[in-house]
Amino acid sequence: MTEITAEGNASTTTTVIDSKNGSVPKSPGKVLKRTVTEDIVTTFSSPAAWLLVIALIITWSAVAVVMFDLVDYKNFSASSLSKIGSDPLKLVHDAVEETTDWVYGFFSLLSDIISSDGDEDDDDGDEDTDKGEIEEPPLKQKEIHKEKAEKEEKPERKILAKVAHREKEKVKEKEKSEKKATHKEKIEKKEKPETKTMAKEERKAKTEEKIKKEVKGGKQEKVKPTAAKVKEVQKTPPKAKEKEGKETAAVAKHEQKDQYAFCRYMIDMFVHGDLRPGQSPALPPPLPTVQASRPTPASPTLEGKEEEEKKKAEKKVTSETKKKEKEDVKKKSDKDTAIDVEKKEPGKAPETKQGTIKVVAQAAAKKDEKKEDSKKTKTPVEEHPKGKKQEKKEKYVEPAKSSKKEHSAPSEKQVKAKTERAKEETSAASTKKAVPGKKEEKTTKTVEQEIRKEKSGKTSTASKDKEPEIKKDEKMPKADKEVKPKPPQSQVKKEEKSESQVKKEAKPEQDIAKPEKTVSHGKPEEKVVKQVKATEKAAIEKTVKPKPAKKAEHQEKESPTIKTDKPKPTSKETPEVTESGKKKIEKSEKESKEKAEMKHLKEEKVSTRKESLQSHNVTKAEKPARVSREDLEDVSASKKAKEEAEDVSSTKRQKSPISFFQCVYLDGYNGYGFQFPVTPAYRPGESSGQPSSPGQKQQGQ
């Protein structure tokens, strides 16, 4: 507001100044245009001015008489009296003549001054009449005609000058064409002897000569025709180049003799500036030679470049084929290991016989996880060391089981104690976050539906699952020799990379962790089943480190739904477990160890994104194992295809968001685009591969 008032005050002050003056100020240029003649005319227009002029003349004349002693007073007085007495008329005439002479001289001076000013005014008037095209008296018209004739002569001279300039340009263009022709002749002459020599030299050593010519700076033009020669041997020159070569050859035949002499003449002309009188040295003549030299050698250089590009392309193709072969070999090895793991996993089915409970828990877990993940934020990082300690304890439990069958009972007790502790922790965590009743109702409905479906399929799977165990035991020792990685180091590195990927991996483990709770509340005969599940859990925890608080909350939410459905499956499981006996326990221990080792090998080879996919494969492989072995093989083949497709897409996703984020970063700082609406797309793009995996699980069921 202050600026506006200041501007208003400034405008008012200017108007006040104008009003005080009372008249619009005139530019000083108009005042200066008044001439001396105008001033004289204005002064002498009035009679008072003339009286003043006469008075001035008389006074200054009297002053002059007195100053210079123009009058002899003695003679004047004596003679005047005598003259007057003798001849008074003579005196009067003499006096009048003298005064008239004085007056005439004075007026002549004034007339001269006025005439000079009048001439200047006449010149100004002539200019004005030229502008306005007003009719003048005949004398002035003659002068104007003369001026117009002079003006007409000037454009004629200009036209003549233009014609001469065009002629000069034509001469220059002719000279340029001659220069081009001579330059083409040069190149053709050089190419002709080289064609003869190349016919012989190509057989001996093409590569050595090319290297020598490239090293020598002065023979660069010779290298270009050699490349052109090689192109002709390959029969791939374009038709336009062949036509140009024919034309230049025809010109070269006519002017072979004068070639070098003319070139020397041109070089001397350009270097020393010995130009013809018609040429203007202002225009630099060396340019045409450069332009003429470009078109002809361009073709061999292009041909040489194309050759090099073809060679490079062939090398790239060979290198890419080698890389593809290596990658295929790696993929085959990965597939073999995956097949071994998936074949070993069905051995769990006859030992545990809890396919229904697992499928129920996993189906409920998937729905709850999708709802809860949207609500939950990142859990604190302090909970990671707890998960590590629990995993280490369970690792020590596994070798004890494998070495001695007798100590299986105390190890089972330890696993029970651990699971009970985990349940207590989950109950404490779940009290903080209340679960809505609608979710529980949905999960119970899905649990009941899936139990009904899988009751019918249980009886047929029992006999089929026992047969493949013998073959799998033979493959176990080989896998033990092959796989000896360091799992904890790789896991620590992966945790440091991203917490978001750990969240993704937490889901599959939660699916497997839930069946343990259901068994822990069951009968004492299910201790063997619990031991097998503990080993499975330990193997999976080695591969995937989730956040325990999340897991606890999932377990607490899903535990009431699973408890209601317990009595149906456990009645069938108990007789089947007693039949298997101690042999199954040994097999399960070996299988769990080898599975853990195979998974660690895969984790080291594959990226962090692949890790989540493999953890899903564990849960997927357990489900079809309870249906049939043939279904398992079909599902495993489909999984491999999905894994490969997702691996390729994951690598692309890892690369593309980085470049995209860099572009956004630059635009944001330059101010050409909004930084905030665009950058969030980076996170969903990165995690877009994860939501598809639960859908794949449901398809597997």
From Swiss-Prot:
Region (Disordered): 1-28, 117-256, 273-654, 676-701
Expression (tissue specificity): Detected in heart (at protein level). Skeletal and cardiac muscle.
GO biological process: heart contraction; positive regulation of cell communication by electrical coupling involved in cardiac conduction; regulation of cardiac muscle cell membrane potential; regulation of cardiac muscle contraction by regulation of the release of sequestered calcium ion; regulation of release of sequestered calcium ion into cytosol by sarcoplasmic reticulum; release of sequestered calcium ion into cytosol by sarcoplasmic reticulum
Known glycosylation sites: N75, N617
Biased composition (Low complexity): 684-701
Acidic residues bias spans: 117-130
Positions on the Lumenal side per record topology: 69-701
Localization of this protein: Sarcoplasmic reticulum membrane
Start-end of Basic and acidic residues biased regions: 131-256, 303-351, 365-385, 391-426, 437-485, 492-643
Post-translational modification: Phosphorylated by CaMK2.
Membrane topology note: Single-pass type II membrane protein
Alphabetical keyword list: Disulfide bond, Glycoprotein, Membrane, Phosphoprotein, Sarcoplasmic reticulum, Transmembrane, Transmembrane helix
Main location per the UniProt record: membrane
One Pfam family hit: Asp-B-Hydro_N
Positions of transmembrane segments: 48-68
Start-end of Polar residues biased regions: 8-24
GO CC, any one term: plasma membrane
InterPro entries for this protein: Asp-B-hydro/Triadin_dom, Triadin
GO molecular function terms attached to this record: protein-macromolecule adaptor activity; signaling receptor binding; transmembrane transporter binding
Function recorded in the entry: Contributes to the regulation of lumenal Ca2+ release via the sarcoplasmic reticulum calcium release channels RYR1 and RYR2, a key step in triggering skeletal and heart muscle contraction. Required for normal organization of the triad junction, where T-tubules and the sarcoplasmic reticulum terminal cisternae are in close contact. Required for normal skeletal muscle strength. Plays a role in excitation-contraction coupling in the heart and in regulating the rate of heart beats.
Protein name: Triadin
Organism: Canis lupus familiaris
